[in-house]
């Protein structure tokens, strides 16, 4: 692997910039982060037994290895999945599971403030292409997003809808290679349903947010707990004796109230 040649796109002078795998290399500091990230991922794996069972089956069967849905997929890479998700230890477990099935994964961060640099470094060492670092600006965000699209994905995985929107607005030549996508958030689903209503959505997108396992568990318990955790981290207040007002009664609101 060699260093990036074009400093205007992604200068390695950025102390926490890294990217993988083809044509790039980790800086020494970020290589040191990889070990820490690996431990985080292993911790998450120990608490995600269902996904680990799926990974074991994927590892045996390799369902994506020789999957060529379009004649244009002739590079032997198998199914190519482009992801714009939160780059966290939990997402890392998903990415490694898809890779175990024979897919080529390219990942960028859906939120500059949620990216865990050590986890991203560990994924690069696992052979997954990562275009993300914590705190990137708007220009770099879209640079990273377009690097994922440059891999010509067959499936998109979105958290907020930016991949699908970019494809339909500026990268329409990629649509012929795509068989479908997924969207995790209510925000993204609303965007895509509006596109479908207007007749401009060019490939099917699965609304992950509508799955029972999403709203009954993740929205209710996950968002409920993480919201309280965020309040505590931001304010350091004692909850005892406080009055809470929850505006809204969807599954997230119910979880917070619980």
Predicted regions and their residues:
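Active-site cofactor/substrate anionic-group-binding motifs, chiefly glycine-
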Residues: 82, 95-114
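Glycine-rich phosphate/diphosphate-binding loop of Rossmann-like nucleotide-binding domains
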Residues: 88-103, 218-258
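Glycine/serine-rich phosphate-binding loop and adjoining beta1-alpha1 elements at the start
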Residues: 2-66, 76, 107-242
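Conserved beta-strand elements of the Class I
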Residues: 80-82, 245
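Extended, highly charged clamp/arch subdomains and adjacent linkers
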Residues: 67-70, 97, 101-104, 152
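N-terminal cofactor/phosphate-binding cores enriched in small/glycine residues
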Residues: 33, 51-54, 82-86, 90-91, ...
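Gly/Ser/Thr-rich loops at beta-strand to alpha-helix junctions
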Residues: 83-91, 111-115, 161-163, 250-252
């Amino acid at each position: 692997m060699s260093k990036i040649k074009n400093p205007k796109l992604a200068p390695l002078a950025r102390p926490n910039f890294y990217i993988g795998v083809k044509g790039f290399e980790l800086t020494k500091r970020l290589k040191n982060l990889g070990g820490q990230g690996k431990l985080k991922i292993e911790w998450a794996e120990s608490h995600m037994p269902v996904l680990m069972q799926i990974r074991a089956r994927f590892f045996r069967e390799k369902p994506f290895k020789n999957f060529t849905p379009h004649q244009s997929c002739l590079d032997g890479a198998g199914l190519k999945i482009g992801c714009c998700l939160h780059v966290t230890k939990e997402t890392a477990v998903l990415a490694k599971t898809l890779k175990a099935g024979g897919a080529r994964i390219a990942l960028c961060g859906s939120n500059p403030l949620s990216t865990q640099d050590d986890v991203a470094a560990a994924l690069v060492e696992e052979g997954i292409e990562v275009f993300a670092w914590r705190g990137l600006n708007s220009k770099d965000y879209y640079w990273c997003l377009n690097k994922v699209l440059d891999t010509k994905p067959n499936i998109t995985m979105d958290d907020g809808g930016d991949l699908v929107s970019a494809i339909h607005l500026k990268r329409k030549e990629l649509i012929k290679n795509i068989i479908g996508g997924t969207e995790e958030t209510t925000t993204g689903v609303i965007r895509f349903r509006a596109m479908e209503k207007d007749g401009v959505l060019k490939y099917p997108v699965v609304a992950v947010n509508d799955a029972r396992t999403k709203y009954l568990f993740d929205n209710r318990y996950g968002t409920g707990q993480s919201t309280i955790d965020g309040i505590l981290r931001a304010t350091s207040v004692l909850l005892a004796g406080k009055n809470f007002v929850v505006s809204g009664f969807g599954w997230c609101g119910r979880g917070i109230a619980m």
